């Protein structure tokens, strides 16, 4: 019998213009765009990754400007397995606002949803956010923290793969005998339209 791939739903949140879409394009296409031009609204990206010999189907939602108007709602967070909370390392306010985003995610996302704090634009010289403070903040919340650069492809893939691995560990997936994924995931995936990249 052919074994179904594991299916996971992820999203990436944070203030407008912190580099969320650039992280997605680097992870999915291994390209960098200074400015992405997605239309307003949710956009779905799909990718299959191989972890420990198992194929994992990822569906990742990009807010595509919705966060600028704080228009994310309960349905956006429903059924998520993992969340990347992103700030711009050259903008202190965007880091301070990760606390608001984390609070929102804790209220609206499933209780077992894994979260990671992500610094973007690590290639910039004008870093203003103290990495030690962020690391201490993340450690106190028992969250992992990555510094990334979409432009220079620093830690981007590692961040996403770590999130996926932590989700699988949290859900106690056994890699050698997985025959079925979480209930209703196949139906949800098939209903979504968007950017499909393998």
UniProtKB/Swiss-Prot annotation:
SUPFAM superfamilies: P-loop containing nucleoside triphosphate hydrolases (SSF52540). GO terms for cellular component: plasma membrane. The keyword Acetylation does not apply. It is found in: Cell membrane. One of its GO terms (molecular function) is GTPase activity. It is a lipid-anchor. GO terms for biological process: vesicle-mediated transport. The modification Cysteine methyl ester is found at residue 195. Keywords: Cell membrane, GTP-binding, Lipoprotein, Membrane, Methylation, Nucleotide-binding, Prenylation. Residues 196-198 form a propeptide. InterPro entries: P-loop_NTPase (IPR027417), Rab (IPR050227), Small_GTP-bd (IPR005225), Small_GTPase (IPR001806). PROSITE patterns: RAB. A lipid is attached at residue 195 (S-geranylgeranyl cysteine). A motif (Effector region) lies at residues 36-44. GTP binds at residues 14-21, 62-66, 120-123. Gene3D superfamilies: P-loop containing nucleotide triphosphate hydrolases. NCBIfam families: small_GTP. Belongs to the small GTPase superfamily. Rab family. This is Ras-related protein RabH. The gene is rabH.
């Amino acid at each position: 019998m052919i074994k179904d791939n594991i299916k996971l739903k992820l999203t990436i949140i944070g203030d407008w213009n912190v580099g969320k879409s650039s992280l997605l394009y680097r992870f999915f296409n291994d390209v960098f765009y200074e400015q992405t031009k997605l239309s307003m609204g949710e956009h779905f990206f799909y990718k299959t990754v191989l972890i420990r010999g198992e194929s994992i189907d990822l569906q990742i939602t990009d807010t595509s400007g919705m966060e600028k108007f704080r228009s994310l709602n309960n349905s956006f967070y429903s059924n998520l397995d993992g969340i990347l909370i992103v700030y711009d390392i050259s903008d202190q306010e965007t880091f301070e606002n990760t606390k608001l985003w984390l609070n929102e995610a804790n209220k609206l996302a499933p209780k077992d949803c894994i979260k990671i704090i992500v610094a973007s634009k690590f290639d910039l010289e004008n870093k203003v956010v103290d990495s030690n403070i962020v690391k201490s903040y993340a450690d106190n919340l028992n969250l992992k923290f990555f510094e990334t650069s979409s432009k220079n492809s620093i830690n981007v893939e590692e961040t996403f793969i770590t999130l996926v691995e932590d989700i699988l560990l949290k859900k106690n997936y056994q890699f050698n005998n997985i025959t079925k994924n979480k209930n209703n995931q196949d139906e949800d995936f098939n209903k979504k339209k968007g950017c499909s990249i393998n």
